[in-house]
């Protein structure tokens, strides 16, 4: 319901969107693709309170109403779909959720650091399109020259056509998950759009964890 998002009003900094603490498709379907009878993350176990591919649905609704308001997505659904990925439910390779959702940024993984840095940047007046420097985030750009010190992954069109190319891409991603040594990664769409994954955010210190 498009009108439902108007209840919030336009935020000062931006919208934060998550599908919840489980991927909405895993939550809705069994491994045999049968619809689950109950939803363990909804009061009363009621099924159907969230849509399939919830992050995409929520963001598309927001973008229809708030054309220029920053949208930042996070949580396990967005994090696991941050780059081109195989979608078991449709048996297809899909683009980064950043593109299909229309969001501006992904706060990837544990976002205690990145979400504060994003808020500080927006609060300072920085455009969301210029927030490209925060560890633990994924952004999109059309400016190849602005992507530095990065490993180029196989293009989306390559992984779409070749399983081996996807395996190489996944291996490179896997080898760059350590926040202390990981490199920046990026993949190309249609030769002109780039999705860039910054290195993971550093882990929290003991005092930071205590504050959380």
Residue map of PLM features:
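Long hydrophobic segments that form regular secondary structure
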Residues: 204-212
């Amino acid at each position: 319901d498009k009108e439902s998002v108007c209840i919030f009003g336009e935020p000062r900094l931006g919208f934060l969107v998550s599908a919840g603490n489980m991927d909405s498709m895993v939550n809705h379907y069994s491994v045999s693709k049968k619809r689950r009878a109950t939803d363990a993350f909804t009061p009363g176990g009621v099924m159907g309170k969230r849509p399939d591919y919830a992050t995409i649905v929520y963001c598309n609704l927001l973008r229809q109403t708030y054309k220029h308001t920053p949208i930042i997505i996070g949580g396990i659904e967005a994090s696991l779909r941050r780059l081109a990925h195989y979608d078991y439910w449709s048996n297809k390779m899909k683009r980064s959720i950043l593109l299909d959702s229309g969001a501006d940024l992904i706060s990837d993984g544990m976002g205690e650091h990145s979400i504060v840095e994003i808020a500080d940047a927006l609060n300072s007046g920085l455009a969301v399109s210029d927030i490209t420097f925060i560890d633990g985030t994924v952004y999109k750009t059309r400016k190849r020259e602005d992507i530095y010190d990065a490993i180029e992954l196989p293009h989306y069109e390559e992984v779409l056509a070749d399983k081996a190319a996807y395996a190489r891409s996944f291996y490179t991603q896997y080898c760059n998950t350590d926040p202390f040594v990981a490199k920046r990664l990026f993949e190309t769409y249609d030769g002109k759009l780039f999705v860039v994954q910054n290195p993971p955010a550093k882990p929290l210190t003991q005092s930071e964890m205590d504050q959380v």
